[in-house]
């Protein structure tokens, strides 16, 4: 009986059940974060970095409005002011040049908030007074236009960022086009054309002075003394008849044999052009000779 009373007086000690420790969501500066932040969480000492990402207080204010998809013409001043001040309060190490602008905007927001909370006088209660947010909205709209224009300009392709200029060295290549040579068949065809035109001139049979091939060679070189190409047909005078045409043709052949003429043709059956090469001879007067004449003649190059 006594033993039962002793057991009732001193009940056995129960071992406490261990509770599972709550797992933190994150660790910030060694401190666990157990609850999900209700708003954008900014860790300590981070405002300096965050504010550097904004171009000024208007940029920060516009960011808060855009983040919540708010109407810029109907800003909830109380909520925006609270969020804006939260950004300012987390700064521990002040940077006065940077903080001054943001503190001024915080004061402006606080003033607008207080003006909207104050009751209006009865005499203007039913009248449409000026919205305390009007000036701030105007500044935000103007800043938003400039910011959008800057973003559009930044999106344009930029040299050395989006593309690079290509540089290539192109050597100065002057192509010398050498016309193809003319064969005897082409010359005879051209001669036939000249003879046909010479037949158109008819006259009385009179005795003429003998035509000299050597003299005609000199006449041809004189005609071509400018060193340019001339049409083959311009060397002939149809009024001289067939005899004059043949003498001129023989003179051309003699000059070509002496390498004093350059005869070219662009295409088969195309026009023939002739250029004098006598300008390259600087060794005094040329001694022109022909198998069709008895004695040589002298021609001074231009």
Curated annotation (Swiss-Prot):
Primary localization class, coarse: cytoplasm
UniProt entry tagged with the keyword Cell cycle: yes
Coiled-coil residue spans: none
Domain of life the protein comes from: Bacteria
Keywords assigned: Cell cycle, Cell division, Chromosome partition, Cytoplasm
InterPro entries: ScpA, ScpA-like_C
One GO term of the biological process aspect: cell division
Keyword set includes Cell cycle: yes
A GO cellular-component term linked to this record: cytoplasm
Subcellular location per the Swiss-Prot or TrEMBL entry: Cytoplasm
One Pfam entry name: SMC_ScpA
Family: Belongs to the ScpA family.
Known role: Participates in chromosomal partition during cell division. May act via the formation of a condensin-like complex containing Smc and ScpB that pull DNA away from mid-cell into both cell halves.
Subunit structure comment from the entry: Component of a cohesin-like complex composed of ScpA, ScpB and the Smc homodimer, in which ScpA and ScpB bind to the head domain of Smc. The presence of the three proteins is required for the association of the complex with DNA.
Name listed for the protein in its UniProt record: Segregation and condensation protein A
Species, as recorded: Xylella fastidiosa (strain 9a5c)
